[in-house]
Amino acid sequence: MEHVHSIMIIKKENKYLNYYDDRWKMYLFPNMKGNNIEEIKAKYKTDNVKFLFEKVHEKFSVSNNKMKLYHHYFYEVEDSDIEGKYFTLEELLKDPKVKENNEDIISFIKEYYEKK
């Protein structure tokens, strides 16, 4: 069974918005279950949302202690007024917990922007 999630990429220059997740005890990219661009537009109160790419990959689920198949959709939200904590990808990867649990997502994003 695929686990579908949308990842929102909100940039200021070379930094990306992340939020601290109390459950995971680490910073994460804004995300939501499912793949509905209209929900993303409503959440951020903007029509400036664009689909970038998608990735299907297997990943170990720490919370369920087993391998799962994930289908991630990546969207860019263009709105410089969104407040929060912004990091470079390198800054995020300096955190061992982020590196262990989210390096795949960060590498997908890095790969996308390096090809642009």
Please provide the spans of the model-predicted regions:
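Acidic, metal-coordinating catalytic segment for phosphate/diphosphate chemistry
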Residues: 1-7
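Short connector loops at helix/strand junctions that flank enzyme active sites
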Residues: 3, 29, 68-72
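Conserved Nudix-box catalytic region and its N-terminal flanking loop in Nudix hydrolases
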Residues: 6, 12-47
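Short, well-ordered beta-strand micro-motif
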Residues: 9-10, 74-78, 88
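Hydrophobic residues at beta-strand termini and immediately following loops
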Residues: 19, 52, 87
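Nudix hydrolase/Nudix homology domain
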Residues: 24-25, 81-116
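Functional cleft and adjacent loop/helix regions within the main domain
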Residues: 25-30, 59-63, 76, 115-116
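Active-site segment of metal-dependent pyrophosphate-handling enzymes
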Residues: 41, 45-81
